[in-house]
Amino acid sequence: MSASTRNKHSKIHGNEKLDISNDEFDRIRDALKNEEFRKLFFDYVDEIQDPENRKIYEEEITQLEKERGVDVTFIHPQPGFVIKTSIDGELKCFINIASCKVVERPNNEVSVNSQTGQKGLSWSIPLAQIPPRDDLDANNKLCKVYDVVFHPDALHLAKRNAQFRQCLIDTALDGVEREYHVNLDRANLKFPKLDYKGMARPSVLRTLSKNPTAEEKEPHPLEHMYPKKPEADAGQSKVLPMKTKVTAVPKFAVPKYCIKHSHDVDMAEYTDELDAKLQVTVPRALVVEIELPLLSSTADCHLDVTEKSVYLLSEKQGAKYKLKVDLPYTVNDKAGNARFDTDHRCLRITLPVVRSTPREERNLHDTVRNLSREDSGVELNSNGESPVEDEELVVELSEHNQENDSNAFPPTAVVSPRSFLKSNLHYLLPAQFNCNILDNVIVFVLHVTNVQPDSVQTLQQARSLHLQFASMGTGYYPTHYAFLMQLPDGVQPELRIDQVEVDTGDENVVLRLTMNEHCMLLPSYLAGTDSNDLKEYPVFGHQNNNNEKETEVEVAEMEKCDLVSEKSLQINMDHNDVEHALEVTIEPQENEAPLDSLELLHEHQQELQQLHHQKKLNKKQRKRNKKQRSLSESACEDLKLAQEHHEQPMDTLKLPHRKQRSYSECNESSLGSSCVQRGILKRFSRYGPHPSISDSCSSIDDCSSTYSCSVDAAGTGFSQSFGSIPEERGGDEAGLSESCKKTVRFNDHIMKQVFRLDSSILGQRKKNQKRRDCKLRAQQRRLSEGDSADYVEVDSTHGSGDQPAHKTAANAQYFKQHNNNHPHVKDNKKQSLHDSGLDLTNGSINNKNNHSNENATKRNEADAKNTMMFEMDDVDEEAQDAANI
């Protein structure tokens, strides 16, 4: 194939280079090396550029065209001004606005605007266009050059009138776009300081000849070989229609862009799992490429990205762009990035696609499965019921809802629990839940941990609420729970649920129900997993599914208390100034059993208290109960004297238990029952008289009593002071036992345990055990000889008295062992000091003369013994706790 053939099919006006072979290139290179060839080549160039030779060339071309009946006119463009723009936003182009006298002059005529009705001038501007040519810009890049030639008068008017100049520019742009089928960027027009771009080249204007010569009319012998000559009047010039509507010039150009779907390779998508190819068609990211050839940087460019669109705006003079692109997928606008390529003038935006969660995919699959079932027209009924029965049930529900339309609260959509709960899942009822009511708000606390917030679903109705949620276990396996709360029928029928709020946390789920009116009197509610598994729960305290029997017993107790309280009782209160006591007498009215109902109620309450208290005993209390200690004889004497004063029967008033000490508690503590008054402290002051073991026992250690007795019980059945410390009494009351007086003292010292970071717990345990042993030995050494002698004397005195044998046997055994270990105590029987070393007996030397002081000294010695035993017990308990740690 020759070079001429290849050049014929090549794109001369495009961006393609000249197609030339290596052989042809070598021949041209060798020829240019020859000096004679170069001389001939330069002579040819000079001959072409010579004006005289060009004139001769034009005359010859005119003569040849005239022989064919065509008039030829050469147009020589004269420089005017240059317009710079781009073609399709890609290629830079220049339009030369030139002048030539050959082109007709512009003319005008008066016309009326059809839209506004105003008169004006309608201009007709002739023009001539020269075919485009390729050229290079200042950066040696390829560009296009178009020449549009007007009459010189048109350019003169454009210089004098700005409106005519704009009209001239629009006419030139319209001619180029119409003739060469290109799109020019009119929003970014520039006017460089040039008169003409490139080298001016003449163009030819051809018209049909009207007056042929006689020689031309003679037939030519070879005329039949050529096509017939066109006649002058045969054809008419093509008249382009005038624009009736002026198109608005856009202020901004729309750049070219493309959207690419980016998808990385995930080996999990090539498995045989059912959900392996769910996200195959969804890309990982979207790449938006925008071509901006007129921008050298993005400093003056504004870019906004949302989840579904990309907005670009550039207001730079000469580079005005505006673009809005709608994205096919939802993207994460916070994690995207943009980069501008200065070499290719391209802006590349990468946006990651937001994929659906597994839960949304499961919901989509359920929806598709339900739609497929509806389309098939056949539904499987697992219970074997006919569709007619289901339709009847639906009709009955709808009729029931129509009856409730008269109420102020419209019924919600009828959704059966079977459709609310998924049949392929097993739902559990929360093991523990609380119910609290305040005004018109009911709060349920479901004790379930690690609840997934997105799994919570509610179904609200007028008098019921259905809740389902899932909890993630330790093995990352979900456990599904369901909770249906329903108000009982017949209880406050006007009560409705207005609003539901569900709050999930790490430890529990809080369900808040706002009712339409006050609901503090609501006695109970129904709860379960569904409507077939509902149980009634009373509205008070903490409800546990495992202690339903205890709840029933407490409800029965409350009912019995209500029956007794409904009976009319007669209460008489007498104040005795001599004994400083208040006597309360409770008698039923006539025709009623005076004591049967009260005694039966009292016995029933004691049984419940014992049963309830035995369940709450911890290891420490059980261990203390196992160690039985004998009562000191001094304390037994005082208790016996106090018991003789109250042998007469007295009725009691039973009031409900409260957290603070009430009137009924102190009154019941003074009755002649089997329970003994107890103290509220385990440890006592080192510098005061210590109570005996029987008085120092806390109320919580006694299974048959639930009251604290930190009050004055000085020989009376009732005390008027509940919180104050009793004062010392004299006179007739000096003989009463001081051990029955309870004194409360508090220590400012705070016990704390500190563990070092670099030591082990076992090491600390051994050190603490050694410290406690040393402290115990020091406390045992503090017992004086007088204390031991007094113990022996007390043993000999009370052993021969009227005390029972089982009360003194333990004391005698202890004193006997103590005397064997300390033989020197017999010499100092009169000395009685406290374990701290202070004399608290106030004159122990005169014990034989003062009988009351002697009794006080004996009681102090017994209290010191009991205190030592309590401290030993506490040391054992602390050692046990340290071993557990």
From Swiss-Prot:
The modification Phosphoserine is found at residues 376, 784. Residues 213-232, 824-837 have a biased composition (Basic and acidic residues). GO terms for cellular component: cytoplasm. It holds the Pfam family PIH1. InterPro entries: Kintoun, PIH1/Kintoun_subfamily, PIH1_N, PIH1D1/2/3_CS-like. One of its GO terms (biological process) is axonemal dynein complex assembly. The keyword Cytoplasm applies. The keyword Zinc does not apply. Residues 612-629 have a biased composition (Basic residues). Keywords: Cytoplasm, Phosphoprotein. Interacts with Pp1alpha-96A, Pp1-87B, Pp1-13C and flw. This is Protein kintoun. It comes from Drosophila mojavensis. The lineage of its organism: Eukaryota, Metazoa, Ecdysozoa, Arthropoda, Hexapoda. The gene is Nop17l.
